[in-house]
Amino acid sequence: MIETDKLAAKAVSAERLISASPASPNEEAFERALRPKLLDEYVGQEKVRGQLDIFMTAAKKRREALDHVLLFGPPGLGKTTLAHIIAREMGVNLRQTSGPVLERPGDLAALLTNLEANDVLFIDEIHRLSPVVEEILYPALEDYQIDIMIGEGPAARSVKLDLQPFTLVGATTRAGMLTNPLRDRFGIVARLEFYTPTELARIVTRSAGLLDARIAEDGALEIAKRSRGTPRIANRLLRRVRDYAEVKADGVITRAVADAALAMLDVDAVGFDLMDRKLLEAILHKFNGGPVGIDNLAAAIGEERDTIEDVLEPYLIQQGYLQRTPRGRVATASAYQHFGLGAPKTGPARDLWDNNA
């Protein structure tokens, strides 16, 4: 049942226009076409860019493989893009895979033994590596060697294989799920942060140019403000606004055109969609602002518990519209203000069975 709920949550996330997860293979292909190729083209993440520039320049001067890199942060912020940029800037090949795909030690061994000197191996969702595969990775990262078993039963023996020097780039949205031994083997650890509206407006303007779409400065900024700090969402909204501009306007994306298009798509001024508003309005109107238990809230809005916890809540909490408390979910003053309501002077409603009430 739990696994079914998780799958349902993933399906809901993929269906949302403002989801940070890739919606389809077609969208992934679209993202690749817009992806910056070099570090100078990469917008935002100034601290991470500065660090990587220094580390890569030093590694190239010494003609060494770049130290292993761990990139973590929310989805859609450019971890995969940075992995490709690292390989291109270092002038080496990139091999890409993901944690769930590497089911057996042999899967990883096959990748490692085919790497050329200083190549980049990119493992997305690295927190989902199985323990047995992770064990193979440790000596590969430290000593550029792997131990493989030859034969079966009593006749089995371990053989040590030397590898070419390489760089592992691991990406994860859940750094806390990495084991300490794996995390400690990364020499470069970088957290990607949400983007500012100004940074996203630059990304939208660049993407519009690649798409041959005409866009005004205020139109790019309007899309950026509703993109939840995430380039993937910004590019997705740009595609839909471009369609609207070509059909309903003269093809130029102005602020007014962007506002009308996004209103049609139910994306409001702060990037909330219908599901975000449904959740907050349920807490505000049905439960007097909270606290309300997660199961009651799920029943009230007709969604699975996992969908609320994994898909809807994170952004609302991060933006300060919702709080998780020991007694349940509580709407904040920002939530009341967003819906034009006055916050209750006595605070949120208390639990009927709260002894402190």
Curated annotation (Swiss-Prot):
Pfam families associated with the record: AAA_lid_4, RuvB_C, RuvB_N
> What Enzyme Commission number(s) apply to this enzyme?
3.6.4.-
**GO CC annotation, single:** Holliday junction resolvase complex
Q: Where is this protein localized, as stated in its record?
A: Cytoplasm
Keyword Ribosomal protein listed? The answer is no
Which positions does UniProt annotate for Mg(2+) binding? 80
Similarity section: Belongs to the RuvB family.
Q: What does this protein do?
A: The RuvA-RuvB-RuvC complex processes Holliday junction (HJ) DNA during genetic recombination and DNA repair, while the RuvA-RuvB complex plays an important role in the rescue of blocked DNA replication forks via replication fork reversal (RFR). RuvA specifically binds to HJ cruciform DNA, conferring on it an open structure. The RuvB hexamer acts as an ATP-dependent pump, pulling dsDNA into and through the RuvAB complex. RuvB forms 2 homohexamers on either side of HJ DNA bound by 1 or 2 RuvA tetramers; 4 subunits per hexamer contact DNA at a time.
What is the official name of this protein in its record?
Holliday junction branch migration complex subunit RuvB
To which species is this protein native? Ralstonia nicotianae (strain ATCC BAA-1114 / GMI1000)
